[in-house]
Amino acid sequence: MGFSSELCSPQGHGAVQQMQEAELRLLEGMRKWMAQRVKSDREYAGLLHHMSLQDSGGQSWSSGPDSPVSQSWAEITSQTENLSRVLRQHAEDLNSGPLSKLSVLIRERQHLRKTYNEQWQQLQQELTKTHSQDIEKLKTQYRTLVRDSTQARRKYQEASKDKDRDKAKDKYVRSLWKLFAHHNRYVLGVRAAQLHHHHHHRFMLPGLLQSLQDLHEEMAGILKDILQEYLEISSLVQDDVASIHRELAAAAARIQPEFEYLGFLRQYGSTPDVPPCVTFDESLLEDGEQLEPGELQLNELTLESVQHTLTSVTDELAVATKEVLSRQEMVSQLQRELQSEEQNTHPRERVQLLSKRQMLQEAIQGLQIALCSQDKLQAQQELLQSKMEQLGTGEPPAVPLLQDDRHSTSSTEQEREGGRTPTLEILKSHFSGIFRPKFSIPPPLQLVPEVQKPLYEQLWYHGAIPRAEVAELLTHSGDFLVRESQGKQEYVLSVMWDGQPRHFIIQSSDNLYRLEGDGFPSIPLLITHLLSSQQPLTKKSGVVLFRAVPKDKWVLKHEDLVLGEQIGRGNFGEVFSGRLRADNTPVAVKSCRETLPPDLKAKFLQEARILKQYNHPNIVRLIGVCTQKQPIYIVMELVQGGDFLTFLRTEGARLRVKTLLQMVGDAAAGMEYLESKCCIHRDLAARNCLVTEKNVLKISDFGMSREEADGIYAASAGLRQVPVKWTAPEALNYGRYSSESDVWSFGILLWETFSLGASPYPNLTNQQTREFVEKGHRLPCPELCPDAVFRLMEQCWAYEPGQRPSFSIICQELHSIRKRHR
């Protein structure tokens, strides 16, 4: 019987929590009781000492000081003083010994309760996410894709004309590709969920409970030692008191840690209630495309997607394996240290080892989680690898429907097409091209001439802006804009003329727009005519249009964007690829979740407000913001190479040192520009830099950035969102951010670069990292790092901010190092 086999159910978890609360209350009662005993012994010793002082005047018997009575009394008073000293020493021994150790035990017990609850909640959340939420999401998407595929197939089969049939077939092939790819994701997700379920109920949860039982039993043994030490110190020599103490000692001796929780287990233990494991939902295949449950689809449509998935899973497996080895080494090291300390520690000092025992149990639990992740990735890799090995060097199987379509094409039709490449080959070429760039973006749109664009897309159309704001926008004679009249369904042409704004209502009748004279089918055509002909708007006013005043270039409408696939996820929401409808510019679109509170949405837009003012080749470029409706978007240039950290980890092995020097030089140039603008980034790291297809590095993610006139920003919030391992000591200790603190972060970025994406301060927690740095320690030199670059790193990590180099000096130094390096 044990926690791991009897308390795996939610009821068992509740019972454990109640037990921990009850035991903590008992320990607190013991501590108060012992403290009262110490206080009582001190007071009693003080009273005895006071009695001795009162008789120190040497009152003697009438027969003189040499009489037996006087000598006896003197001996009594002297021994009373000795007794007071003994009792006082006992009180101090109780305070520094059992009472102090009991306080440490209570503190460790509270920490154990907190750690256990956090780990149990984490395990349950991860199980729910992997086993339920992710699977349900995949199933919902699966059903949608099955419906889309079925509908596309029906339209394809019903199409009669060649043109319609080709178009329908193209849509059907696309739907098949999406369905097959998602089917593969669902198969991999189910396999991962099954393994996570297995690890959760076989290893991770039982391991957590076994660790808890081990620590509880160890603490029970320590409590036994504390009570025995207390009784030994407080024991007196009188027979009646000794008899009581023998009974108390016997009671303390009856404590047996290994049997301490048997009664608790008998009362609350139960058979583990393991819920059924997830399986492939075969109802999804009722209208499917001859798909097999639990089997990956490998054909001409999915070959490249399977290859890319295999590569990705293999890379993730390598990282997971490295993590497992690291955690195994940590567990072994802690076991060795604990064994050594146990040999050199008195049994009654075992309470001092509790924190290390808890560290060991936490490390073992972390190892179990890492092994679960490794097994999931291993299983997914084996599924993908076996499928690829079955294919061998041959061609992937054709999709049956498309294969039939090949045979149905008549020779006459082929001749009529003039030897054109078969449709399937064109489609295969199209699909293979999908995977060439880092991200896929929507296809180009057909561009529309400016004059043919609708009114709301015209740069000089400002919408329903207040009339008072018009006077601020129009500054020179002939400046104009078109706006919507407030409170009326009509459009107004506002023009600056003779030093004051003039407002002309655009007349509309018979679907024509005019001021005086000819009418035009649209307002853009009317404005284009007035601007090109330079004729007065009205004969009476003589006003002529010279220059259109554009609306804020950063303002975009949601309709201005064509969203593509999701390419990432940020702190505030998803990130998508996309295009601008106006000119087909590829963009990255950051979205803000609608459920976020207003203050977080304001922080989301903070990045856009910062970037509006900047224009530098090494700073990611802002294109616009969409704030007219939910969700809010920030639109930025699309940097195809992805983030710098992933780039280092995947491409670093083939990069030359000179290339790395060029890339960190780009980062330094961008930060020098920000420094000149009094901008403090506050979150400079490899993960927040982007890489173009030509290996140009750009600074990104300005969500934590601030602009301060004196170049210093004082943060008032806590450290919850602060990247501790990248942040300077003065920022962590006093909330003082400056360009000098960004220089410290740049030193960590240099270290990440030349360690090819390694994590700084591995195996250290955030608190341990702070203590490590405060003691004067710094990161070691990476293997590939030139000596001159490491010296620059050390300058960036000077403890005093004033001793760190500026970004201007860093740029010059990196440029010099790059010129010297061959």
UniProtKB/Swiss-Prot annotation:
Instruction: Give the reactions, separated by semicolons, that this protein catalyses.
Output: L-tyrosyl-[protein] + ATP = O-phospho-L-tyrosyl-[protein] + ADP + H(+)
- Post-translational modifications: Autophosphorylated on Tyr-713 in response to FGF2. Phosphorylated by LYN in response to FCER1 activation. Phosphorylated by HCK.
| Entry's Gene Ontology cellular component terms | cytoplasm; cytoplasmic side of plasma membrane; cytoplasmic vesicle; cytosol; focal adhesion; Golgi apparatus; microtubule cytoskeleton
What PROSITE patterns does the record point to? F_BAR (PS51741), PROTEIN_KINASE_ATP (PS00107), PROTEIN_KINASE_DOM (PS50011), PROTEIN_KINASE_TYR (PS00109), SH2 (PS50001)
Reported EC number(s) for this entry are: 2.7.10.2
Could you tell me which residues carry Phosphotyrosine?
A: Y261, Y713
Composition bias type Basic and acidic residues, residue spans? 403-419
Query: Region Important for interaction with membranes containing phosphoinositides: which residues?
Result: 1-300
Name the Gene Ontology molecular function terms of this record. Answer: ATP binding; immunoglobulin receptor binding; microtubule binding; non-membrane spanning protein tyrosine kinase activity; phosphatidylinositol binding; protein kinase activity; protein tyrosine kinase activity
Q: Which residues form the F-BAR domain?
A: 1-260
Q: Where does ATP bind?
A: I567, G568, R569, G570, N571, F572, G573, E574, V575, K590
Q: How does this protein assemble?
A: Homooligomer. Interacts with BCR. Interacts (when activated, via coiled coil domain) with TRIM28. Interacts (via SH2 domain) with phosphorylated EZR, MS4A2/FCER1B and HCLS1/HS1. Interacts with phosphorylated KIT. Interacts with FLT3. Interacts (via F-BAR domain) with soluble tubulin. Interacts (via SH2 domain) with microtubules.
Under PANTHER family, the record lists: TYROSINE-PROTEIN KINASE
Function as written in the Swiss-Prot or TrEMBL entry:
Tyrosine-protein kinase that acts downstream of cell surface receptors and plays a role in the regulation of the actin cytoskeleton, microtubule assembly, cell attachment and cell spreading. Plays a role in FCER1 (high affinity immunoglobulin epsilon receptor)-mediated signaling in mast cells. Acts down-stream of the activated FCER1 receptor and the mast/stem cell growth factor receptor KIT. Plays a role in the regulation of mast cell degranulation. Plays a role in the regulation of cell differentiation and promotes neurite outgrowth in response to NGF signaling.
Q: Would you tell me the protein name for this molecule? A: Tyrosine-protein kinase Fes/Fps
- Native organism is Mus musculus
| Gene name linked to the record | Fes
